[in-house]
């Protein structure tokens, strides 16, 4: 149902305010929540029934309409259901709305059940509902310069697609919640994963400041260091060559220098010079370590030093990474655009990059970590008396273990 008048909006708001479960979705002009505008909102409170509320491009009018639904979004008594809810929460944040109450994210629910599979709505609809959804490409066309924006379409063209999103998500929720096999799985979902969603949304919304001048200095530092390495590599090889070319690297290392007897080749007959292979032969000649170091610097330069300034949001002056909750099978978070969890921490090159991240004015960065958390969990689960005693007494667990093994006093362990 298309809700395109103020009177219809008032009616649907009253219905939503009395609903215990609300499936919701936002339609926007892009996939980056911090850079897009809302085109509309869809809601479903029972299967096979949904509503779509268009949101105009004029900012003041858009804020007015979205604000009318504030009591719905901020009603702590209703369960909010969505697919990839972090995105919708972020979009609504940019309109001054905080989503309150318990959450049920179908993407995260399926991740808990089948972490190694895909979790997109189209895939889940096919698997669980035997239903093929309307694909976004059918509305705006395939990716490319000619692709339309959702803003280019009339509400009449969008509302069936948008209503389907909210309806399918509600249907998936009704199936997936029954898939939680035991209380431990339920607790993991409701007590850990779901409360984490708005936390990650706030982290992404806050973003982090970047010191452009520090990056410029780092760029000069990395470029200078790479040139020095190049000269060292050329001197060892006895000739200049393109270090970025796997073909030329292979020819220099294995044809000219013959640093190993057994070489590996690809199906096309080219020498293998992948990072894994070069690491495995690093001790055969100093030039290999130099080439690996050069590659590492080039990667850091391209991934962070040169890329970070381009990822600064012009509206906030910060970079806003995306924290991915449903990627790793182990439950660990990952991040992308940019990947802020993969910056080297122990070497000088990593420190050079990290100094470009700065706190807000009047604030400080605070770094905290659990002390030996894995071993503490092992002690708790195993109820091992020796481990528990070591932790309770404040001793170093490794020193206590060594003392036990060698039957000496812990004070003698060095």
Regions found by a protein language model. Name each.
Residues 87-94, 252, 377:
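Phosphate- and divalent-cation-binding pockets in alpha/beta enzyme and binding domains
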Residues 160-161, 388-395:
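Active-site metal-coordination segments of metallo-dependent hydrolases
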Residues 67, 123, 351, 375-376, ...:
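Feature representing long, continuous alpha-helical segments
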Residues 1-57, 74, 83-85, 100, ...:
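Conserved "right-hand" nucleotidyltransferase catalytic core of DNA-directed polymerases
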Residues 393-414:
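Generic long, charged, amphipathic alpha-helical segments
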Residues 62-77:
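Short, basic/hydrophobic alpha-helical segments
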Residues 79-89, 113:
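Acidic, metal-coordinating catalytic cores used for nucleic-acid/nucleotide bond scission
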Residues 98-114, 394-398:
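Conserved beta-strand -> loop -> alpha-helix junction used to position metal-binding or nucleic-acid-contacting
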């Amino acid at each position: 149902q298309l809700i395109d008048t103020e009177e219809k909006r008032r009616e649907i708001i009253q219905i939503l305010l009395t609903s215990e479960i609300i499936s919701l979705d936002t339609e926007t002009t892009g996939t980056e929540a911090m850079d897009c505008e809302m085109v509309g909102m869809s809601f479903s409170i029972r299967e096979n029934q949904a509503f779509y509320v268009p949101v105009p491009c004029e900012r003041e009018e858009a804020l007015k309409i979205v604000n009318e639904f504030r009591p719905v979004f901020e009603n702590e008594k209703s369960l909010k259901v969505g697919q990839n809810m972090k995105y919708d929460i972020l979009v609504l944040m940019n309109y001054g709305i905080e989503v309150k109450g318990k959450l049920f994210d179908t993407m995260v629910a399926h991740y808990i059940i089948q972490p190694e599979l895909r979790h997109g709505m189209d895939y889940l609809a096919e698997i669980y509902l035997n239903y093929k959804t309307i694909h976004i490409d059918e509305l705006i066309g395939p990716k490319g310069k000619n692709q339309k924006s959702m803003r280019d379409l009339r509400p009449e063209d969008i509302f069936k697609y948008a209503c389907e999103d909210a309806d399918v998500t509600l249907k998936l929720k009704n199936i997936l919640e029954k898939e939680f096999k035991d209380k431990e799985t339920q607790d993991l979902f409701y007590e850990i994963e779901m409360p984490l969603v708005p936390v990650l949304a706030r982290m992404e919304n806050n973003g982090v400041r970047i010191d452009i001048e520090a990056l410029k200095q780092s760029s000069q530092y990395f470029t200078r260091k790479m040139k020095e390495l190049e000269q060292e590599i050329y001197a060892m090889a006895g000739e200049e060559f393109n270090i970025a070319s796997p073909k030329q690297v292979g020819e220099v290392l294995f044809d000219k220098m013959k640093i190993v007897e057994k070489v590996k080749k690809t199906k096309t007959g080219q020498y293998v010079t992948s990072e894994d292979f070069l690491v495995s032969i690093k001790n055969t000649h100093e030039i290999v370590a130099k080439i690996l170091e050069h590659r590492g610097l080039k990667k850091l330069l391209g991934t962070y030093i040169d890329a970070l300034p381009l990822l600064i949001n012009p509206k906030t002056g910060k970079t806003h990474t995306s924290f991915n909750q449903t990627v790793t099978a182990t439950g660990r978070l990952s991040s992308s655009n940019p990947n802020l969890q993969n910056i080297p921490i122990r070497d000088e090159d990593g420190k050079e990059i990290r100094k470009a991240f700065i706190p807000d004015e009047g604030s400080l960065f605070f770094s905290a970590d659990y002390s030996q958390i894995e071993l503490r969990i092992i002690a708790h689960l195993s109820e091992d008396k020796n481990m528990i005693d070591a932790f309770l007494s404040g001793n170093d667990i490794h020193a206590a273990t060594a003392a036990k093994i060698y039957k000496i006093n812990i004070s003698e362990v060095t």
